[in-house]
């Protein structure tokens, strides 16, 4: 017999954050790593485009704060989701694993939010 009142799962929320983090890591993060980690140190790029004053002004704007927040939080959720399910696949069962990994991601999200807002 089919259960008429199935328990609602919270997994779609975590899969959504995992998927968004995975897409961010695949599309946005490599561009930023190449720009900040390779091109800028080599001096390739417009003169003064990434001066301290311009980067600080960007980081303190609402678009910059949103970008920094997403650049930190989305890969964080993706990574902790992968670790949680990877440990499950390896049959390493952490007591209250969902609370440990997703709770850590939530705490670090709040810490990141506080850090970005007070920038």
Curated annotation (Swiss-Prot):
Broad class of the protein's primary localization: membrane
Assembly and interaction partners: Part of an enzyme complex containing four subunits: a flavoprotein (FrdA), an iron-sulfur protein (FrdB), and two hydrophobic anchor proteins (FrdC and FrdD).
Protein's recorded name: Fumarate reductase subunit D
UniProt subcellular location: Cell inner membrane
Functional note: Two distinct, membrane-bound, FAD-containing enzymes are responsible for the catalysis of fumarate and succinate interconversion; fumarate reductase is used in anaerobic growth, and succinate dehydrogenase is used in aerobic growth. Anchors the catalytic components of the fumarate reductase complex to the cell inner membrane, binds quinones.
Transmembrane domains' residue ranges: 24-44, 55-75, 99-119
One of the protein's GO biological processes: fumarate metabolic process
Keywords of this entry: Cell inner membrane, Cell membrane, Membrane, Transmembrane, Transmembrane helix
UniProt cross-references to Pfam families, sorted A to Z: Fumarate_red_D (PF02313)
Family: Belongs to the FrdD family.
Family annotation (InterPro entries): Fumarate_red_D, SQR/QFR_C/D
Source organism of this protein record: Cronobacter sakazakii (strain ATCC BAA-894) (Enterobacter sakazakii)
Topology term for the membrane: Multi-pass membrane protein
CDD domains in alphabetical order: QFR_TypeD_subunitD
GO molecular function term, any single one: succinate dehydrogenase activity
Entry GO terms, CC: fumarate reductase complex; plasma membrane
